[in-house]
Amino acid sequence: MRFNEQADGVIILDQTLLPGKEAYLTLTTAEEIWDAIYKLKVRGAPAIGVAAAYGIYVCARRIDTAEKSVFVNEFRKIKEYLAGSRPTAVNLVAALNRMERVLVAHPTLSVPEWKELLYKEAIAIREEDAAACRQIGENCLELLRPGMGILTHCNAGHLAVSEYGTALAPIYLGQERGYGFKVFADETRPLLQGARLTAYELSRAGVDVTLICDNMASVVMRKGWVHAVVVGCDRVAANGDVANKIGTSGVAILARHYKIPFYVLGPTSTIDGSCPDGDSIVIEERNPDEVTEMWYSRRMAPKDVKVYNPAFDITPHELITAIITEKGIFYKNNR
């Protein structure tokens, strides 16, 4: 993901087409950016934050006024619009708020000067995310041993962030250092991020990865093939509860049963200190067609059947062995 000045837009890889096709999109309007985030053309909490930062800068460039009050008013309208694209991932709103603070912190500057600072802030958000992800990987690698079997859910690799990933960062670093991890990737229904994205990027990197259906996690754990679970996070509440892709809490319950450490990896930007617990996190519900029709040549459920399709679930803090950020490893007793 990057800003292209010549195209005056944000360049993203359309993840909805992977692994069959690699297609890059140029996003130049608020509507295109909103659509890309909502339809998961760009996804992963950190990546959404970076996309929002670049996106609101692109939109701000197009606000054609020298009047600062008019500029701020239009900027805030765009900010609120983009913030509604995905309600669960805290990085989205955090990045947009950070971009707005550029204006608030420099009230005496002109509109062109504001625009220049917005560009620099968007770049800083991306660079900080990349550095954080690598450090997350280094911190987690301290807990892993060469040859371990590692299970992951959804996609928290370089497709979900600026570089390396969060949950996949230690796997990539381990691959560079000859650790020989054996990774089990849950397919992650209903949108198959594990099958389409995690298996895709790990196999391209030469990692030993085995794809399994979500309901097979218990089997590979029982066989002793899994020694650790690593997942990303979209929001961490103040008490340590975690919102992540639907199915994560089930994996955590299985890991607890089989006495396998369950690690949540994410940058500190995903921690929402204003959110007391998981029950306070708004869970996005998505189109029923994602369950009944997507990926199938024909509908696979009765036409009139009701569908419940939450995009995320809450993993209680008591099921989490440690939360690993760029700042360090945090266990239950030192939250």
Swiss-Prot record:
Alphabetic keyword roster: Amino-acid biosynthesis, Isomerase, Methionine biosynthesis
Keyword Amino-acid biosynthesis among UniProt keywords: yes
Pathway: Amino-acid biosynthesis; L-methionine biosynthesis via salvage pathway; L-methionine from S-methyl-5-thio-alpha-D-ribose 1-phosphate: step 1/6
Class of the enzyme per the UniProt entry, highest EC level: isomerase
A Pfam entry, by short name: IF-2B
Residues annotated to bind substrate: 43-45, 86, 193, 244-245
Marked site (Transition state stabilizer) residue numbers: 154
Entry's EC annotation: 5.3.1.23
InterPro entries given in the database record: IF-2B-related, IF-M1Pi, IF_2B-like_C, Initiation_fac_2B_a/b/d, M1Pi_N, NagB/RpiA_transferase-like
GO molecular function: S-methyl-5-thioribose-1-phosphate isomerase activity
Catalytic activity of the protein: 5-(methylsulfanyl)-alpha-D-ribose 1-phosphate = 5-(methylsulfanyl)-D-ribulose 1-phosphate
Keyword Amino-acid biosynthesis: yes
Residues at the catalytic site: 234
GO biological process: L-methionine salvage from methylthioadenosine
PANTHER family documented for this protein: METHYLTHIORIBOSE-1-PHOSPHATE ISOMERASE
Function, in words: Catalyzes the interconversion of methylthioribose-1-phosphate (MTR-1-P) into methylthioribulose-1-phosphate (MTRu-1-P).
Record family assignment: Belongs to the eIF-2B alpha/beta/delta subunits family. MtnA subfamily.
Protein name: Methylthioribose-1-phosphate isomerase
UniProt organism field: Parabacteroides distasonis (strain ATCC 8503 / DSM 20701 / CIP 104284 / JCM 5825 / NCTC 11152)
Gene that this polypeptide is encoded by: mtnA
